[in-house]
A protein has these predicted regions:
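Extreme N-terminal tail/first-helix region
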Residues: 1-12
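Short linear motifs at secondary-structure transitions and domain/linker junctions
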Residues: 8-10, 22-24, 108
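Short, contiguous alpha-helical
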Residues: 10-14, 21, 29-73, 114-159
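Hydrophobic alpha-helical core bundles mediating ligand binding, dimerization, or RNAP-core interactions
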Residues: 13, 17-20, 24, 87, ...
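Short alpha-helical scaffold segments that flank and stabilize functional sites
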Residues: 26-27, 56, 93, 97
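Acidic/histidine-rich alpha-helical segments that form the ligand environment
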Residues: 76-112, 125-138
Length: 159
């Protein structure tokens, strides 16, 4: 049976987001802006970065290059629920993009990209690879959120 990478991506996008929401929903208000060290990101900062990355990738796949801080600035709201809503909006856009493509189209370079985008990405943008980057980035920061909560006394193996 031939593997369907599109279905794999959809499953993984749903799974990692489910884990992120489960973890984020346990964050208490005093923990939301807590920094493990002054030079480290708070839970809020990590959630904004996760969302900003997805906004950045989604914008890139539309053939537009924006700076990372510009993508993060598009994440509106200060409280946890507002940022979770922004994460949901970005994920819906990613899933809509995926659903508009066949499995094969996900491996075709995005056409007619400006040269500055190709230069930035160091070549063609393959949608499957870009979405896989989004997944890897989100899962990495989910681990940080879990670890940061562990530092505050929440053992994920005993919750």
């Amino acid at each position: 049976m031939k593997s369907n990478f599109k279905e794999f991506l959809l499953r993984e996008l749903n799974e990692v987001r489910k884990e992120l929401i489960e973890t984020a929903s346990k964050i208490k208000l005093p923990e939301y802006d807590w920094h493990p060290r002054l030079d480290m990101k708070s839970a809020k900062d990590l959630l904004v970065e996760i969302c900003g990355c997805e906004v950045w990738i989604n914008t890139l796949m539309k053939g537009k290059l924006i700076q990372w801080d510009e993508a993060e600035a598009k994440v509106k709201g200060e409280d946890l629920q507002s940022i979770l809503n922004e994460l949901d909006n970005a994920r819906k856009e990613t899933i809509d993009f995926l659903n508009s493509k066949t499995n094969e189209e996900l491996f075709n370079p995005i056409e007619n990209l400006p040269q500055d985008i190709k230069d930035y990405w160091k070549g063609d943008i393959i949608p499957a690879e870009a979405i896989e980057f989004t997944l890897r980035h989100e899962y990495y920061h989910l681990g940080q959120l879990i670890y940061n909560r562990w530092l505050l006394g929440y053992n994920p193996y005993k919750e």
